Amino acid sequence: MKILYSIILFCLVSMIFLASCKSDNKINSKKRSIEYIQNDLKPDEFFPAGQVELQIQSDGLTMYGFAYTADGKGPHPTVILLHGLPGNERSLDLAQNIRRAGYNVIYFNYRGTWGSKGTFGFQNAINDAISAVDYLTDSINAEKLRVDTSKIAFAGHSMGAGIALLAGLKDPRVKSIVGISVFNPFTLLQGEGAEGNLIGLKEYLLTLGMLNCNPNKFLDDILAKLDSYDIETQVSRSNKAILVIDEHQNNTNFSKFNPRQNFDYKMWNTDHAFTNRRIALTKEIVNWLDDTMLNKEKVK
């Protein structure tokens, strides 16, 4: 009887041990430790996290940026961070935290902004985001930066969020998209309030000396292609993983996509820069990236 009891006890302990091992190895955002936010991590002896300055070509012109490379040999899933207009809020606090969670993060300035060559335009910036993917998926750059080219995501704020959606929805190499306070020209620049929005944008662009940009041409180019910037329609035709967190009501129609497994639209009570929600925003983004790029059960 004692022998039988010992065998049963051994089997139960073994099952619990195996289950715990399986749980520890499975990427699950609900169980991810937040140590990456709370504590400094011990660097890998041979492949420590670092920063690499980048020069990315877009239509033959140089864009300047840098990579926050993740700790460890990799290759690592990689997030391309897309800034807004003009890019005063770079979200580098998010970049550092996302990197500490095990992701490479790429930051760059679009053509015609902050010293990058060329002319700043909305469509140009969309093309620039795709050029950044081209850069990362080049075999030499991927090896140097330890990029897992099968796990690339866009994360953008404001105008950068609109760019992330419009570029990411069309590029099969981008597996997941995060949009924070999404700038949606299709809803902002037509219908009620459009005239005021256009005037406000033009007046704001006139104050932005860090941009090589003609405000009239910038806006005229958007209006000429407005139908191609219909984010809602493009989302409806895609099964790509998308997280949108807004603090405004310009995209409330996105909520109709919430029943989809790979879509989540939320509205938070905060300001445009999410000033009082930076830690919560970090956790929300990292959990989303974990679920949609690392936890394959949640990826369609």
Regions flagged by a language model, labelled:
Residues 18-20:
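C-terminal motif of bacterial Sec signal peptides marking the signal peptidase cleavage site
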Residues 76, 83-87:
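Active-site glycine-rich loops that stabilize anionic/oxyanionic intermediates
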Residues 29-73:
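N-terminal cap/lid segment of alpha/beta-hydrolase-fold proteins
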Residues 121-143:
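Alpha/beta-hydrolase active-site loop
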Residues 218-290:
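Serine-hydrolase catalytic core
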Residues 166-215:
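Hydrolase active-site cap/lid region
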Residues 98-117:
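Conserved alpha/beta-hydrolase
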Residues 144-158:
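Alpha/beta-hydrolase fold nucleophile elbow
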